[in-house]
């Protein structure tokens, strides 16, 4: 099974100087195609940390397991480390990509030199990801897709990757998530019930407590639709047996 993951890179995100817009958009783009985000990591502008993280997910891809999007750090300023880190993680040198150079030259003419053209230095063997905004391409290597930190560029580039390379995965896995509200619920009293449902129905079970204004627990299951429906019957019966009342969850 292939998992989708994302890296969001940049000190400006971790410091709060910029608000992250990538996580919610990645979830939205994947969900629209019947896909799910399996994991997300935020990384600062620390080359050793970026390289180690990329190397770990690239090594997992020896089993063809993860499809990874990385947002940020592919520019040409001194705080943009992602291109070099990706090359180091892949065990290859940076090399100037002729197609990326051509795009930059077409966009900026003589202004491509001497600095903008640095953004055409990719890990050797990388493929291009077209940028519909300013033609400064992203790149991909080992099922890792590197795009700018600018949302207006990054998000259509992610869409292009999904629609071009992974359409065969769209809407392949049937998935359902359902939940109930357990009025005045106490999580510690629900643990045994949750473990029983996980074991019997092979689903993921979750509980989300809320203290104000009215204490309750959102209790639910997610996974294959038929198993989720069975699990919810068991959860509702179990909640009642524990002496709690419940109502169907309605998203606000």
Please give the residue ranges for each predicted region:
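Glycine-rich phosphate/diphosphate-binding loop of Rossmann-like nucleotide-binding domains
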Residues: 1-40, 44-45, 229
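Short coil/turn connectors at secondary-structure junctions
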Residues: 1-3, 63-65, 123-124, 135-136, ...
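Glycine-rich beta-strand-to-loop/alpha-helix junction loops that act as flexible
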Residues: 9-11, 70-78, 148, 222-223
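N-terminal small/polar loop signature for handling phosphorylated ligands or for N-terminal nucleophile
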Residues: 27-89
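Short beta->alpha linker loops
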Residues: 42-45, 99, 117, 185
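An accessory alpha-helical subdomain
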Residues: 143-238
